[in-house]
Amino acid sequence: MDDVGTKTAAGEPKERDPKRWLILIVLCLSTLVLVIDNMVLTVAVPPIAEDLNASASDLQWILDSYMLVFAGLLLTTGSLSDRFGRRKVMLIGLLLFGAASLIATIADSPEQLIGARILMGVGGALIMPSTLSIVITVFDDEERPKAIAAWSSVTMVGLVGGPLFGGVLLDHFWWGSIFLINVPIAAVAFLAAIVLMKESKGPWRKADPVGMVLSMVGMVSLVWTITEWPKEGFGDPKVYVAAILSVLCLVGFGIWETRVEEPMVPLALFRNRVFTGASFSIVLLTFANGGLMLVLSQYLQFVLEYTPTKTGWAFAPLALASLVFNALSAVLGPKIGNRFMAALGLAVIASGFFTLATLEPGDGFGIVTTAMVLMGAGGGLAMPAAQAAMMGAVPHEHAGVGSAMNDTVQQAGAALGVAVLGSILSSTYGNKMPDDAPGKSDESIVEAFSEAARTGNEALVHTARDAFTEAMSSAFVVGAIGVLVAAALSLVLMRTRGGDTPPTAAVPGAAQPDGSESAEASADVKTGR
């Protein structure tokens, strides 16, 4: 059935789907399998390298191939879900993701595993936009904040629980088990979706093949540039060419979408200040959080000497606080408004980053726990509010591509956070190490520990820990500033003319109280003007 918003043509509220909360469980399960899979892989690199005799380049492609394909296809798959049906696209994605996971378990060469990861990226790109867009169309305005908060909390559980879950699997089974576990989860979600969900899609629109190609090439080039820049340097010819290609394609995409009769992405959405403000807030929030686990996990393992499993458990306070405050956000958001909820949450996250910036090599886990609780609480308040504001500004017929844009800005923000905060960490660490540091110990704390183990130089270990902690503080201050900028943008841009009321009715192409659409507004969204 086509989308008609949350009201009938007569202006009466749509009847609530009695299976909607079961549907939400299926959507959360589908999202969880994607997040956990990526996080689990980070702890499986050593056994994969040993068993498949994979080089450093092979391992990099095993890790990056999924993300490149996933990020590159999001806008296209979101548009396809609006066009052909969100349930149908999600089912195809689950089928492909499960099959690719099965292929990954039997891979006996790096090339086969990379191929399986590429297929998993395609499957993930089909699944992810469909999940949030179905949440938007199944739940009405009153229940939607609660549903989005529940869906959002699953991401945090996967991010924190993935490495821990992977460590448990690898302690008892071979590395292929981290992929095999995806198969039954995908199968359950597939069957449950068939039984519980009705199809939903927007009005039929012509395909936009030029927009699809430009968005795919542009996003793949952008993400590749962001991930390779810290390792190769911006002066590297490959990075330089990829950066130019991404700019040309994405600028070309923007120009094309404003001229084509039926654009893949309605760029008129960015004329809505709530949508734009929420988008920027999400980018900067994920920018800060993207580098958090990269930087803090190294501190826990190399400075506090935690094992990988203990490091995973150390992030539990963040996940628990996020779950609690996700629920609180769902209750308070409709009362005080998404704008203030997002700004409050972002300010709390910034306080967590500033707390982490005070860490010293001799500090225990107490300060880390305090910071984790603050950041989990802030994320639990801010992310659902920003996502609800962003998706509330998207007409229902564009729910799929709106969800894809939410996923895309998160991917770009997280990748940029890893690149920028990682670069700050690396360069500051090198500057803090003495000029006569032996070997390559001034390049990373890993190299310093290797050099110390080889030469028995215990003083080098202490020097490296001091330098790393100072570098980490600099990275976290930058993260805090990014989040504070996001908070300011939330307050300034996410303001609606009628106060902090849900913005959907004022959005071009959104359903009006009588169930109709403004002809001019609808045309603006259709043509991207």
Residue ranges of model-derived segments:
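Short, Lys/Arg-enriched, Gly/Pro-containing loop segments at transmembrane-helix junctions
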Residues: G202-K206, E262-A268, P434-D436, G498-P508
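Transmembrane-helix bundle of Major Facilitator Superfamily
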Residues: D2-V195, F325-A330, K335-F340, A347-A350, ...
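C-terminal module of multi-pass small-molecule transporters
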Residues: G85-L94, I103, P110-E111, S130-T131, ...
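Transmembrane-helix exit segments and adjacent C-terminal regions of multi-pass membrane proteins
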Residues: D2-T31, V274, A388, S450-R529
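C-terminal membrane-cytosol helix-exit motif in multi-pass small-molecule transporters
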Residues: R144, P184-S200, G218-T227, S246-R259, ...
